[in-house]
Structure formats: C-alpha cells, structure tokens
Amino acid sequence: MSLFNVSNGLRTALRPSVASSSRVAAFSTTAAARLATPTSDNVGSSGKPQHLKQFKIYRWNPDKPSEKPRLQSYTLDLNQTGPMVLDALIKIKNEIDPTLTFRRSCREGICGSCAMNIDGVNTLACLCRIDKQNDTKIYPLPHMYIVKDLVPDLTQFYKQYRSIEPFLKSNNTPSEGEHLQSPEERRRLDGLYECILCACCSTSCPSYWWNQDEYLGPAVLMQAYRWMADSRDDFGEERRQKLENTFSLYRCHTIMNCSRTCPKNLNPGKAIAQIKKDMAVGAPKASERPIMASS
C-alpha cells in the first residue's frame, strides 16, 4: 500500500520499505542490558528503569520539495510518556523535535483531528495505546495529498461532505417549539450520528483510493444516510436521486475495510447497503428502518 504526498505538483509514492533518514537516532540493546541492575545511566527521572521504545514517523516538508519523504526515528522512555500514541507525539514535539507536524485537539476521541495510520491501521492517535513491545510506525492517512508530515489535505473530503447537504430539510418545520420525533424514530439514528468525520474509513477504502474525485466514500455516504433516516427530514427521495449515478454510491464493493477500521465502532458499509436497498425497492417509514448501532 502506497502513501502519497505533493512534490512539485506531482504525487510521490512512499512504500513501507523506504530507507530511514541518515539522521535517524540509533537504538539497540542487549539481554545483559535488560537484566542489568539499574544505575544512574539507565534509570529515568521517575526512579524506574528506562523502558526505551522507537517511534518511526513519516516526515515530509513542503518547503523542501527536493527532499523525498522519509521515516524519522525518535526514542522515548515509556515510563516518562502517557499511554497513548498521541501522548508520545506530543512529547516528541514538545521535548525533541518542534518541527514535527500533526493535528490534534480533544484527546478523547471526539474531534477526529488526530486520525492517522498507526502500524498499518487507520485510527485515532488519542485512542490508540502504545505497543510496548515493538517499534511503532506512524504515517498520515493513506492515499491523500499531504500538507506536511502527518497532516493530510482534507479539502476534497469536506467538499464531498458539503455536497450531501448535511442538515435537516423539512417542509413541516413547527412554527414554535421543538421539531419532535418519537423515541423509536430517534433510536434509528444511533450508529449514524456518532460519526466524527475523522476520515479513517474513507482512506481505508480501495474504491475511494482510486475514485475519490467522484466516489463519495464511506464516511460521507453514511452521513448521507443519517439524514435520509431522520424522521424530521422530508427530502430523502431527493437525496437518493443525487446518488443515482455510476460513481457517487455504486463504487462501493462491500470490501468492508471501513467498518473494520472505524475508531467509533460504526458500520458505514451497512448504511451504504441500506441506501442501495432503498433505491432498489423503496424507502421504509422512519420508524421501520433498521437499527445501525451495534448490539
């Protein structure tokens, strides 16, 4: 699987076998060192023996377009680091290399900012625990243009999201008070509204890799279904008609990478399948729609 960035207007592929930078910090150990009695050389400031670990992180600087993307290694003492990968990234940026660039905000799996590929899996760095036994490789979300280091360009992703009109469209909005729905109708939105638009699912989808200019991808399609399934929305038929073309919806081939990688345990593949069914046999009443939330 290749990762892409922008260099002089062209996409440059970085394969996992790419050589590390000559500036990579070397780290090695031996059985004797692991079994040695702690001394001032191998004891951290906490008084515990150091638990050293390497993080190999994708680096690319748009200000130096002639330099190829590379993996740069950083060594941390896990006894001085929080338990999550995002904790390690923040420690590296604060204490070792301030040029390292990545997105982050809430640190609790709500905002979706820190989505990246960690050890081959798209996930949120704030929810991914550090593997204490093996080196960790961190890349940006795959098959996206790269702004810098671990920051993907999500311009096209948000353009597609805007295209589905992600808001209620109703002909019967109450003139006063709330626009109510029954508990059963509300229950049909579980497993849909929790999406945080992190793009982990879309960037894990091979169909989206090759057709992202026209295929909307699992995240956006699940959000499209979220509004179709809402009992307060009166434009479900029009929303489905907008997807009636070769690429927008039907490039989904039920590979299901999207459902496997979702850090919120949602099922975009199931939502996409329901859109296809609605378009084939007609949409059911809101209160009769299948429940998308995992049991």
Curated annotation (Swiss-Prot):
The keyword Nucleotide-binding does not apply. It is a peripheral membrane protein. PANTHER family: SUCCINATE DEHYDROGENASE [UBIQUINONE] IRON-SULFUR SUBUNIT, MITOCHONDRIAL, SUCCINATE DEHYDROGENASE IRON-SULFUR PROTEIN. GO terms for cellular component: mitochondrial inner membrane; mitochondrial membrane; respiratory chain complex II (succinate dehydrogenase). Its EC number is 1.3.5.1. It is found in: Mitochondrion inner membrane. It comes from Mycosarcoma maydis (Corn smut fungus). [3Fe-4S] cluster binds at C205, C252, C258. Iron-sulfur protein (IP) subunit of succinate dehydrogenase (SDH) that is involved in complex II of the mitochondrial electron transport chain and is responsible for transferring electrons from succinate to ubiquinone (coenzyme Q). Component of complex II composed of four subunits: a flavoprotein (FP), an iron-sulfur protein (IP), and a cytochrome b composed of a large and a small subunit. PROSITE patterns: 2FE2S_FER_1, 2FE2S_FER_2, 4FE4S_FER_1, 4FE4S_FER_2. This is Succinate dehydrogenase [ubiquinone] iron-sulfur subunit, mitochondrial. Gene3D superfamilies: 3.10.20.30, Alpha-helical ferredoxin. [2Fe-2S] cluster binds at C106, C111, C114, C126. Residues 185-215 form the 4Fe-4S ferredoxin-type domain. It catalyses: a quinone + succinate = fumarate + a quinol. Keywords: 2Fe-2S, 3Fe-4S, 4Fe-4S, Electron transport, Iron, Iron-sulfur, Membrane, Metal-binding, Mitochondrion, Mitochondrion inner membrane, Oxidoreductase, Transit peptide, Transport, Tricarboxylic acid cycle. It holds the Pfam family Fer4_17.
